[in-house]
């Protein structure tokens, strides 16, 4: 259902407020450069520091600006099942094509708790839902066997697998077959994950290099594995640079250097250290982004 290059778009701020004009410009930058779908209010969109009204405003602005040209998948995850249901309902009402649901963070549910959490959301809201496993940020790893229990639900269509583990992604694909699509959650392993059967990537890198990420997934789908492999290797250095500090600090710093939007992030995130900014600047110059 959702495949290819899917950008986890940043939320631009100016003087502490969501910059709606810049957000619309970023959406156009993505669509112009071949991005297949857009995710507002994911990890990269700083969803955890948006209040409820801001969260829904960002989702609505992206849906309005996209105007049905590509799918919009709203980040609606929460460590409260009730809140995730409410956000998912509101996203559906706003016209989202799907929702992205991060595993509950901080409260560390058991695997049974994860099954009950996701089943409750899928039962409550009839919209295509993408599970999101990112244990490095949430403190809980959703095991392949747990994904296999959820995969038969008609509203659960995919998983964003961001453990960085090809073994775990492969186990999900082996267990679930065609019941659920797998999407890479890490730019630096998109190509090998697609070789295992993933359908694309929910990408941080696409914020600054949308065409390169789209070209990689397009080449793979066209059977041009050599081009896809070359793009994978060529973008590896800058993919890794997007994580020299906590996401989205590097990608927002990069967008600031490109003049696309402010590099402003919300506390407890803070501006990139001068040393890392110098390293990032040098890498961006190598890629002729600035």
UniProtKB/Swiss-Prot annotation:
It comes from the Bacteria. Pathway: Amino-acid biosynthesis; L-lysine biosynthesis via DAP pathway; (S)-tetrahydrodipicolinate from L-aspartate: step 3/4. Keywords: Amino-acid biosynthesis, Cytoplasm, Diaminopimelate biosynthesis, Lyase, Lysine biosynthesis, Schiff base. The active site is at residues 132, 160. Pfam families: DHDPS. It is found in: Cytoplasm. GO terms for biological process: diaminopimelate biosynthetic process; lysine biosynthetic process via diaminopimelate. SMART domains: DHDPS (SM01130). The keyword Lyase applies. InterPro entries: Aldolase_TIM, DapA, DapA-like, Schiff_base-form_aldolases_AS, Schiff_base-form_aldolases_CS. Its main location: cytoplasm. SUPFAM superfamilies: Aldolase. Catalyzes the condensation of (S)-aspartate-beta-semialdehyde [(S)-ASA] and pyruvate to 4-hydroxy-tetrahydrodipicolinate (HTPA). Belongs to the DapA family. This is 4-hydroxy-tetrahydrodipicolinate synthase. It comes from Geobacter sulfurreducens (strain ATCC 51573 / DSM 12127 / PCA).
